Amino acid sequence: MAVGKNKRLSKGKKGIKKKVVDPFTRKEWYDIKAPSFFENRNAGKTLVNRTQGLKNANDSLKGRVLELSLADLNNDQEQSFRKIKLRVEDVAGKSCLTSFYGMDFTTDKLRSIVRKWQSLVEAHVDVKTTDGYVLRLFAIGFTKRQSNQVKKTTYAQSSQLKEIRAKMVEIMRREAEGSDLKELVQKFVPESIGREIEKAAKGIYPLHNVYVRKAKIVKTPKIDMSKLLESHGEAMDANTGSKVVKSGEFVEPEILESV
């Protein structure tokens, strides 16, 4: 008789399946709070794994970038072509406090404004706001057909396009560097920067469909909790804490009058 293990007997029973655990039982929902310069503060909810061992749920949420439609944030369907990025900066209870992290156009909007027989003008520039944010702004515009024009095309000369780009850069830099981040974001929605570019370029070549199509955060200053809470419409107590004595620093105790 052969000595050894019987391979058939050592195998487990067939048909026994491993117990499947629903991954959503280990997760919990957190509310997304948009900054106060948006009308709808409750932007939505996000999922994260519960705090377990050394893994903290708050650490997993901080730095998370969320993309939302401006139509949902401002309750205005006409702004549905703008996508807003928000980044989670801090977690308070079950609420994620976010800050503005970027803006972009939807693909269908960009494709809808491109037309034949006209010149496309694009420019980008890095700007710094008064509160220390560095953004890269991208502008787009198109040459406009005149009312008394006979020619079919509205192509601008390369020298004219160069002048228009210089005007775009100048206006974007001027509008951004004189504003903080909140004021700059509020200029994107009514397209006040685009109208300024149209006025400035009128003497070079008339434009239409001029937009700041994209805004990208390049550099952010160190997060100040008081400013973050202020942007969310929450006030901090002035007496947030008391001075802590450094280790190794001796402080003589006060003399008591009576014991």
Curated annotation (Swiss-Prot):
Signal sequence annotation: none
Pfam families membership: Ribosomal_S3Ae (PF01015)
Modified residues (N-acetylalanine): 2
Keywords, ordered alphabetically: Acetylation, Cytoplasm, Ribonucleoprotein, Ribosomal protein
Location of the protein in the cell: Cytoplasm
GO molecular function, one term: structural constituent of ribosome
GO CC terms: cytosol; cytosolic small ribosomal subunit
GO BP annotations, alphabetical order: translation
Oligomer and partners: Component of the small ribosomal subunit. Mature ribosomes consist of a small (40S) and a large (60S) subunit. The 40S subunit contains about 33 different proteins and 1 molecule of RNA (18S). The 60S subunit contains about 49 different proteins and 3 molecules of RNA (25S, 5.8S and 5S).
HAMAP family listed in its UniProt record: Ribosomal_eS1_euk
Family named by the database record: Belongs to the eukaryotic ribosomal protein eS1 family.
Protein name: Small ribosomal subunit protein eS1
UniProt organism field: Cryptococcus neoformans var. neoformans serotype D (strain JEC21 / ATCC MYA-565) (Filobasidiella neoformans)
Origin organism lineage: Eukaryota, Fungi, Dikarya, Basidiomycota, Agaricomycotina
The encoding gene: RPS1
